[in-house]
Structures are given as structure tokens and as C-alpha cells.
Design a protein with these regions (language model features):
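Coil-to-beta-strand transition motifs
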Residues: 127-131, 138-142, 198, 210-212
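Conserved catalytic cores of phosphodiester-cleaving nucleases, focusing on short active-site segments
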Residues: 132-170
């Protein structure tokens, strides 16, 4: 197994491609992704969603990992008022999400059947070194699990957790719209290279609602193949962007990076 790493360290992305880095270039803008890697810009102005996800992930990793997470992130605890000493609202919801997962024996059988947690993987895709971390994997039965916290698992436009994707310019289910098919395709390929075996992919999804819904989704190989095609179609350009060989597209007009760096061009003043 590859050496341990800080998966969220942006410097690591200059050495190995990470799914999060790759998706930032596709979904959040090229200029934004480069600035995020350089540490001069944070694509996500609020880290609460990431912290909620990590709160849940650490719980299913081990009791020790969960306690360490809480200790390392005192900001999730209220420091004033009547709620002082209690979890903040978002993390109270996260506890409900955890309990909802634990209440389903089928989900828990799948999770408990994958004993290796936070399993580091690496490999090469078309000559580019990749690295990732699996939430849980069963190496003998050849499947791995990824936990996803989502806004909703209700059907919208006939799609599970359906939402509009600016990148695809259409409604997609939550798995496609967030680029998770790209992430899981890369993980499956790295595992194949490490073990010589084909692994099935399961998503344990839970909604961030006062009454959370939890479910299991087995990802079809056709969906994963689509993710791999998107990697191969975009990877060379992304690598050239990181190496400074290609010029990034201008920051998206709705991004905070654009708003903070935009300057009026006197030769092209807008007309109303």
C-alpha cells in the first residue's frame, strides 16, 4: 500500500493527480483551480460542508478517528449562548445522518463487510500519477464503498438527487452532477492496477435533512466507463495547465475570484 498522506494538502496535487483537483478544473473553473492549488484562493468559501462530510467519515473509520476529528476541529462546537459546549446545528444534523445509516441493517452489513478504512491507493492513468483514498474496501470480495452526503435523495426531473449541472448544461443525478463518476472511475482503475482485480463500486448516500434518508447505490460499469472517458479527454489539458504550458480560461463571472480580480478595461466599457 502507498505511504500515508494528507489527502487535502493542496501541495500533494502538484505531485499526484487527485480526483478533487481534477474535478475543480472541470466544474469550478481553470483559473479558480490553479489559484486554489497555489493557496491564494479557496474555491469553497464555507468549509462546513467538507467538515460535515469528514465528521461522518471519521465516525465510520473508527471511534479513535472520530474523537481525534472532534479534538482537531473545535470550531464544530458552539462556544457561546445556551448551546455552549454542544455541537453546532450542522453537526447535530450530521449525527442524525449517522444514526440513519446505522438504523439500516443492509447498509451496515455492507459497511461492516469492508474492514479496510481510509485505504490509500495510487496508480497511473495514461502516464499521469494518481493518488486517492477509499472510505472502505473489501479486498477479498472485491468491492469498495464511498460515503456521500447530499442535499437530497428525492427524485427531481426523474433523477435521484437531481440538480442542474452548469458543466453538462442539463439536469443530472447527484452522482454525475458532482463528478463522482470521475472519482470512482479513477479509484477503480487504481485498485485494478494494485490488485489485478476488478472491483465493484457502492455509494452509501445520506441526505442533509432534518429527517435524513440513506440508501445504497451500486454504480454501473457503463457509468464508470463514462467517467474514465472524461478523464482521458481532459487530463492532458489539465496537466498542461498545472505545468504552466496552457493558459487558463478566465475566472467564471459568478465566482469570488472573478469579483475580486476584475478590473475595468477602458477600451471595452460596458453599454446598457
Amino acid at each position: 500500500m502507498a505511504e500515508e498522506l494528507d489527502y487535502y494538502d493542496p501541495r500533494e496535487a502538484y505531485i499526484h493527480m487527485h480526483a478533487s483537483t481534477f474535478k475543480n478544473f472541470l466544474f469550478n473553473g481553470e483559473a479558480e483551480a490553479l489559484a486554489n492549488m497555489a493557496g491564494t484562493y479557496n474555491i469553497f468559501d464555507d468549509d462546513k460542508a467538507l467538515l460535515v462530510g469528514n465528521f461522518l467519515h471519521s465516525y465510520f473509520e473508527s471511534p479513535q478517528a472520530h474523537q481525534a476529528f472532534i479534538y482537531e476541529h473545535p470550531e464544530i462546537i458552539s462556544q457561546r449562548g445556551k448551546s455552549k459546549g454542544d455541537l453546532k446545528t450542522e453537526f447535530k444534523v450530521a449525527k442524525k445522518m449517522i444514526k440513519r445509516i446505522e438504523a439500516d441493517p443492509v447498509i451496515m452489513a455492507l459497511v461492516n463487510g469492508a474492514p479496510d478504512k481510509e485505504y490509500v491507493i495510487d496508480g497511473s492513468i495514461n502516464g499521469v500519477d494518481w493518488r486517492g483514498k477509499l472510505d472502505a474496501v473489501n479486498l477479498e470480495e472485491q468491492y469498495f464503498i464511498d460515503f456521500k452526503t447530499v442535499r437530497s435523495l428525492k427524485e427531481f426531473h426523474g433523477l435521484i438527487g437531481g440538480e442542474w449541472s452548469d458543466y453538462y448544461n442539463e439536469y443530472e443525478n447527484f452522482f454525475i452532477s458532482r463528478g463522482y463518476h470521475i472519482q470512482m472511475a479513477a479509484y477503480q482503475e487504481m485498485l485494478r492496477q494494485m490488485t489485478g482485480k476488478e472491483f465493484e463500486v457502492y455509494i452509501v448516500a445520506v441526505s442533509k435533512e432534518d429527517e435524513p434518508l440513506a440508501d445504497i447505490y451500486k454504480i454501473e460499469q457503463e457509468t464508470l466507463d463514462r467517467g474514465m472517458r472524461e478523464i482521458l479527454a481532459n487530463q492532458d489539458h489539465i496537466v498542461r495547465l498545472i505545468n504552466g504550458e496552457d493558459k487558463p480560461l478566465q475566472a467564471k463571472t459568478y465566482s469570488r475570484l472573478y469579483r475580486s480580480t476584475y478590473r475595468v478595461d477602458p477600451e471595452n466599457v460596458g453599454v446598457l
